[in-house]
Amino acid sequence: MPQTLHVHSRVKDYDILFTDHVLKTLADCLGERKQRKLLFITDQTVYHLYQTLFEEFAQQYNAFVHVYPSGGQSKSLERVSAIYDQLIAENFSKKDMIVTIGGGVVGDLGGFVAATYYRGIPYIQIPTTLLSQVDSSIGGKVGVHFKGLTNMIGSIYPPEAIIISTTFLETLPQREFSCGISEMLKIGFIHDRPLFQQLRDFQKETDKQGLERLIYQSISNKKRIVEQDEFENGLRMSLNFGHTLGHAIESLCHHDFYHHGEAIAIGMVVDAKLAVSKGLLPKEDLDSLLQVFERYQLPTTLERADVSATSLFDVFKTDKKNSEQHIIFILPTETGFTTLAINKDDHQFVEKLDSLL
């Protein structure tokens, strides 16, 4: 499915390249940089799945590889420091490049290293999960966790290019596929109801071209949003639907309990319930959301982990979206979205939250 989307950024424009031939597309992206040093950053899972691909990279380029333990715990300043050490040891200059190959953790981590090493070196993203292809790789957000807080340290630093290949999804476990669908449903529910309806009816096993079309449509929606509001002052805030609660769940629960897309699904359900309670969203829309989550085996409650509303509320207070005095939720409406500001001292809201979980 060779296609290209061009993303306009106030920092730096870049292309999203859809391809069935990753090696050729990467070579085209590198151009004259083929002779420069490249550091490929990936995790153990991706490295073992695609070791032959990394061997081909090593044959064609002046390439080094940084492989780290899989999982969100590696999205840390300690791992950043280890990658800095390798860049320094191999004498990487400002003209050399990083290539990230993996899911959202790999992209966020590698992008953060690229943004901060020598105050910024170029990088290319090759996302290998559905979630990273449709969401985390798009828009330039990079960062790491800090002291148990999700994405606490980061920046907006766009890549030179993003290479999208659905062939990577052939090795993706069903649970991770559903996590990607969760983010696609998020953008569809708020911004593109026809996309939401297509995802509701989609048959993965029999419609590969349909999946490619849905991925392209989802990415196109996010591209449009980040071009209008790159630094999240208005419209891009809508993409945080489900994320206030979702990030708190991720901070308090082990990754085995809830993966990112699953935590966001629970967050979307609670945000939608809040919207229904305030007359902003028809209950039929909430029911539709619950039905499609059930179809993709996405959780809608916190039954897998023993987490209290009080502990969640305490984590809310550290959320990046907050104002000085308020916790910010993104609520879906019949025609889009709105924000809900909850006072950080509103203990009655804790009781309300407890009733919604």
Curated annotation (Swiss-Prot):
Gene Ontology molecular functions: 3-dehydroquinate synthase activity; metal ion binding; nucleotide binding
HAMAP family in alphabetical order: DHQ_synthase
PANTHER family in UniProt: 3-DEHYDROQUINATE SYNTHASE
EC assignment: 4.2.3.4
Record's keyword annotation contains Cytoplasm: yes
Gene3D superfamilies per record: 3.40.50.1970, Dehydroquinate synthase-like - alpha domain
Species of the source: Streptococcus pyogenes serotype M3 (strain ATCC BAA-595 / MGAS315)
Cofactor comment text: Binds 1 divalent metal cation per subunit. Can use either Co(2+) or Zn(2+).
Necessary cofactors: NAD(+); Co(2+); Zn(2+)
Residue sites binding NAD(+) per the record: 104-108, 128-129, 141, 168-171
Family: Belongs to the sugar phosphate cyclases superfamily. Dehydroquinate synthase family.
Binding site for Zn(2+): 183, 243, 260
The protein's name: 3-dehydroquinate synthase
Protein's UniProt keywords contain NAD: yes
Catalytic activity as recorded in UniProt: 7-phospho-2-dehydro-3-deoxy-D-arabino-heptonate = 3-dehydroquinate + phosphate
Keywords: Amino-acid biosynthesis, Aromatic amino acid biosynthesis, Cobalt, Cytoplasm, Lyase, Metal-binding, NAD, Nucleotide-binding, Zinc
Primary localisation category: cytoplasm
GO CC, alphabetical: cytoplasm
